[in-house]
Amino acid sequence: MSDYKSTLNLPETGFPMRGDLAKREPGMLQRWYDDKLYSIIREAKKGKKTFILHDGPPYANGSIHIGHSVNKILKDIIVKSKGMAGYDSPYVPGWDCHGLPIEHKVEQTIGKPGEKVSAAEFRAACRQYAAEQVEGQKADFIRLGVLGDWDRPYLTMDFKTEANIIRALGKIIGNGHLHKGAKPVHWCLDCRSALAEAEVEYYDKTSPSIDVMFDAVDKDAVQAKFGAAHVNGPISLVIWTTTPWTMPANRAISLHPEFDYQLVQVEGRALILAKDMVDSVMKRVGVTQWTVLGDVQGAALELMGFQHPFLAHVSPVVLGEHVTLEAGTGAVHTAPGHGPDDYVIGQKYGIETANPVGPDGSFLPGTYPTLDGLNVFKANDTIVELLREKGALLHLEKLHHSYPHCWRHKTPIIFRATPQWFISMDQKGLRAQSLKEIKGVQWIPDWGQARIESMVANRPDWCISRQRTWGVPMALFVHKDTEQLHPDSLELMEKVALRVEQDGIQAWWDLDARELMGADADNYVKVPDTLDVWFDSGSTSYSVVDARPEFGGSAPDLYLEGSDQHRGWFMSSLMISTAMKGKAPYRQVLTHGFTVDGQGRKMSKSLGNTVSPQDVMNKLGADILRLWVASTDYSGEIAVSDEILKRSADSYRRIRNTARFLLANLAGFNPETDKVKPEEMVVVDRWAVGRALAAQNDIVASYEAYDFHEVVQRLMQFCSVEMGSFYLDIIKDRQYTAKADGLARRSCQTALWYIVEALVRWMAPIMSFTADEIWGYLPGKRAQYVFTEEWFDGLFSLEDNQPMNDAYWAELLKVRGEVNKVIEQARADKRVGGSLEASVTLYADAQLAEKLTSLGEELRFVLLTSGAEVADYAGAPDDAQQSETVKGLKIALRKAEGEKCPRCWHYTSDIGQNAEHADMCGRCVTNVAGSGEERKFA
């Protein structure tokens, strides 16, 4: 017997079976950057319609975590898929570089500004630290395979960006949105600074819960309001609070104008309580017997005076809609210096905004003898005892509740009224315009719209000033006496911005006001405050996108961040853009969930369930990480664990194996000379190209909708089901045994070439390294990189009006599935070994029989059997297997007759009829020594 291996067209490719991504990817990255790949893409896409995904800047502090990886990979998938869709989609990554976390890190090494180092030295150290952090994070982001302008990212500490941030504030002032006020703001005692809404986190805390009695100044007048004939003892209005330390700042008591309040006689005094709260209060304070002396609505008690328990002033009753009956007494202790609602009602009634608390959280001198200099939280017990001594404490208990904490220090914060600068939500209609703009944006998922609408509708004015060292200065001058802004503020801010553009923010602190305004400087002082870092990042649609030429003056199309950014970057960006330009900075806003472990738990070092992206890349490669991100429905929580990543690695192997099979079977194929015209191709090859077209339509639509898990599912279905379990299986015989350059094989190779040309493009946005690797093994002339290409436009499909259309092949696949079941059973029964040892008879009804017989002799190639016949359904023997899924089909199997051909392994009766190839079947003789077999259908 001869060795016929040399006569077969065995698959051959240098494309490795194993990805070895962790080893290979760094070399590919090096080539990308040596070749300046990002510049190559920009050049290739020049002049096309732009799509701008504006990067929300991560904070330049610490190593990247798995959440950063999810975010950057999602962005990269979008940018690359937009490039494939024919857009010029530049991607400029950015970093948020000012602010408190960096100050803290620098303080740990060189001390606080003004102590061991000057403020200027401190800022220089902060700038240096931030630059180092950017470089570390940048290396990790690049390793993820994210393509962008890494040589020229935007940093909020770039001199030009710092200058543009000042200009952004100038435009907002010019539009009338800025005002100054001593409003209560979130204040961190450790930071000694105001905090933004997005810098506040809520944790459980135990606080003293107290009911306090304020005695009526004019008992008779109050008694008359209730129409009470006789009251035994003083009349007290009872408030409830969990912040005893705010009692020194109490200036009023709020009642709801429409709630009913009762005067209730208890032993030795009468209490005023909301009618609906009497029972719960009495139960709480342990009173079992009381008498109701009268009822009035809250409005009737307006401006009645009640004596502060330990200070000399009288607290009037004020009316507010913010009073609820959810807890307490229905009477709200009101300290305008320590609460937003209290402040609003204080403004309405012209009540003093008292703030007896210093920046470090201790009471200022002159507050009260036993309180001066005491930390507010430590003062709680002192105040409780003081109230007890004065006979004003009705009840004390401990309350476990959710309380605001500083995001950085994880310590409780307070509301504290300080002179601050605010962007007003209402004085120039910013709130109304923002709500209008929200409706014109596409929010993905769509619940994001209601979420940000609610936040904008209910948010207070934005406190944009901070008492920090490392930040962009507000660059304002105020009059020494009136504290009014300089009338030429906008002109002065531009002059400051020009200096900052040259020398950075230090230029502001080095500036002598006389240089800008001459003798007028004697009447003005420089505002020492810096801007909230959310102003820095929120203004980047102006300071970066408008300023950089590669964006061509276009507004951003998409912002993509975690779902916490509705109150963070999405909010600050919306406020600033609307305040500056009257319009939203984005057309689409897409949010992703947070990473959790395989059990749905939040990741934390204490639980030991964190997954490091660096470890994953070093072990499995970035493409596995990228495939995991794409495979996940990121609209909710994103689960990651070793097991989940292993599943992604398994999916990757299936896709890689498909690509390798395609490449290996394109050996010796040159599309310029060997490609077969569509109309001359074998029908099943045309069908396979059509399946690729259908898959591409679905995949492109899913990329367009940002449904990347749908992309992966469709890709897997195409590779594993449509190709792997059918087409790639049935073509092996023709591919390996047909004449090398005959039409039967070239038709097949043409289909494989079309398919892999499409497949490599589908993969490129997600499995970028592997797509680049495949690209290098594809036959034919092509661009240097797949990333400059567009979706493959060479695909075509079978026409529906043809007998052998998609519906025909779909039914044939079902028939093949039923035949496979019968073969598997025969193998289990040891009647046959492989499927080529079998010959089948398909007993079919007339309609199905017509379809099956149209394949003629080629039916057996579809079924992968040595013989296949079609017979009348009615004549089926008793042992024929009835199909459960294909109507009008029974299947009988017998062992194939004849001898096994050593070349093609088919069983046939025509072996030995050619003297030169005595042990070969007739078909193989034709393929080896003749003109090659003819195939029309399969």
Curated annotation (Swiss-Prot):
Manner of cofactor binding, per the entry note: Binds 1 zinc ion per subunit.
Uppermost EC category: ligase
Superkingdom of the source species: Bacteria
Subcellular location: Cytoplasm
Signal peptide (residue range): none
Residues annotated as binding ATP: K605
Cofactor(s) annotated in UniProt: Zn(2+)
Main location: cytoplasm
InterPro entries cross-referenced by the UniProt entry: aa-tRNA-synth_I_CS (IPR001412), aa-tRNA-synth_Ia (IPR002300), Anticodon_Ile_BEm (IPR033708), Ile-tRNA-ligase (IPR002301), Ile-tRNA-ligase_type1 (IPR023585), Ile-tRNA_ligase (IPR050081), M/V/L/I-tRNA-synth_anticd-bd (IPR013155), Rossmann-like_a/b/a_fold (IPR014729)
Pfam families: Anticodon_1 (PF08264), tRNA-synt_1 (PF00133), zf-FPG_IleRS (PF06827)
HAMAP family: Ile_tRNA_synth_type1 (MF_02002)
Family stated for the protein in its record: Belongs to the class-I aminoacyl-tRNA synthetase family. IleS type 1 subfamily.
Assembly and oligomerization: Monomer.
Protein name: Isoleucine--tRNA ligase
